Amino acid sequence: MANKFETIEAANRTEFGKGSARRARVAGLVPAVVYGADMESNLHITLNHRDFAGLVRRNGVNAVMELDVEGVKQLAMIKHIDQNVLTFNIDHVDLLAITRGEKVEVEIPVIVEGQPAPNTMFVQDADTIRVEADALNIPEEIVVSIEGMELGSQITAGDIKLDDDMTLVDDAELLIANVVLPAVEEAPAEDEEGESEGESEA
């Protein structure tokens, strides 16, 4: 659980537009915006790209951090990361300002582990589930096991055991994973084989 959070330094942005954002990225910075219900206006900042990317690697895409914006502290969590589709560099970040004890809705990755019954396989239908959780207590992932499950068995969102301080937001019937028969590769039709043999003899 994310009971602890890291501090990351930020600076106020004074320039806006595509040109200024491009210059910031060239300088190793990530443009970001911080918003929240209790904020009078959005806060536009820049983050150190290396520091922020490291925070995401260590804490996941729902990471909570303490922003130090030129000496002013603010708790925030990641809401959206805009990545370049070619370089995968982080182009822009949306951050939600939060307070201790606040509940937030987040999508948490679901990891399926284990092996179903022999001669079956599992299909994962949903990679995430949406829950409401304490902003400072969000798990990086939720693990479900399909170990030994028989053909036709299913796991729905409602089957997943959540911590006491978490509430499922998704439909309880949302299908997460199910056990099916492996796909069978069809053999070539006999007449096609015969035609091939006849052609080769000719």
UniProtKB/Swiss-Prot annotation:
Gene3D superfamilies: Ribosomal protein L25, beta domain, Ribosomal Protein L25, Chain P. One of its GO terms (cellular component) is cytosolic large ribosomal subunit. One of its GO terms (biological process) is translation. GO terms for molecular function: 5S rRNA binding; structural constituent of ribosome. Keywords: Ribonucleoprotein, Ribosomal protein, RNA-binding, rRNA-binding. Disulfide bonds: none annotated. Belongs to the bacterial ribosomal protein bL25 family. CTC subfamily. NCBIfam families: bL25_bact_ctc, PRK05618.2-1. Part of the 50S ribosomal subunit; part of the 5S rRNA/L5/L18/L25 subcomplex. Contacts the 5S rRNA. Binds to the 5S rRNA independently of L5 and L18. This is Large ribosomal subunit protein bL25. It comes from Corynebacterium efficiens (strain DSM 44549 / YS-314 / AJ 12310 / JCM 11189 / NBRC 100395). The lineage of its organism: Bacteria, Bacillati, Actinomycetota, Actinomycetes, Mycobacteriales. The gene is rplY.
